[in-house]
Amino acid sequence: MTISEIAKMAGVSSAAVSRYLNNGSLSQQKRERIAKVIEETNYQPSEYARTMRTKKTKRIGVIVPQIDSESSPEILSGIGSVMDQENYHVLLMNSNRCMSKELRMLETFQQSQVDGLILAASVLTEDHMRLLGQMQCPVVIVGQKCEEYSCVYHNDYQASYEMMKYLLKSGNTNPAYIGVNRRDLAAGLNRYLGVKKALEEADIVMETIPCEEADFTMQSGKEAMRRLLMTGRKIDCLFCATDMIAVGAITCLREHGLCVPEDIRISGIGHGLVADILTPQLTTVHFHYRTSGLEAARLILEQIQNPQAEKKSRMLSYRMMFQGTA
């Protein structure tokens, strides 16, 4: 079934059918006649034809660093909610925190017909920025502050600062820290700097406390905690850069006969599902990941509709969750 055939059956011009399909100006009488024929014939416009007419594919590219992380499903839920309402398809790619793979994905989306790209970024290298600059569509960054593109992110620095201040408030003087790679400006560098500032205010030098690095997983958190214990240093409180790392650290401590929070007070950050199913519940910081997905989707649609729209930077709030582990 073609537009010409629909037009002939409805007794209107092909141009009238095209205006109907694109929500253009049309008399109510013609609109009703066309709608009746479309319903009777179960006509579905060709996606290719629609793209040729509107120059829009109704497809959005999305890249996430780790599909099974605590944050990615929430971000995707927010994006999907908005895109479903606007009849957009989401083309999802998962880089598994592999930088070379992520760069290849950007190259793929350069060659694909998408109306916009949402990048949930953990690292933004010069190669990332070069490839993003070659995109022929709007770009929105989630999870990192970025001057070059519209972005949605959390205040990792302030959240980490507040949590470390809380851990030290009860008289603890032997803190430790398990972070992630500081090339990740949000979870790595800014959380580290927030902790460092809180320690400085307590007259503790960050470089003198036991520190380890993990890679966002429970197992790596467990291994990092084991390395901290092997130093023999006294630790009475521990800040972990993610909830999953914190759960791994707690698992290790229990295997070594230590109790949380009686022996060591522990906090994470992010407030994923694991924080609340743990016993006792994990002290953490609630980040609004679903909201970040909603906001990113709205920003990309705004830029698709108005390519000249100014870039926007949106920092979301957070909520301290003082629960059972600290």
Spell out what each predicted region is.
Residues 226, 230-326:
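Flexible loop/turn connectors
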Residues 64-74, 92-101, 152-162, 178-226, ...:
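Hinge/beta->alpha junction and helix N-cap segments in small-molecule ligand-binding domains
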Residues 1, 39-77, 85-88, 96-98, ...:
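N-terminal helix-turn-helix/winged-helix DNA-binding helices
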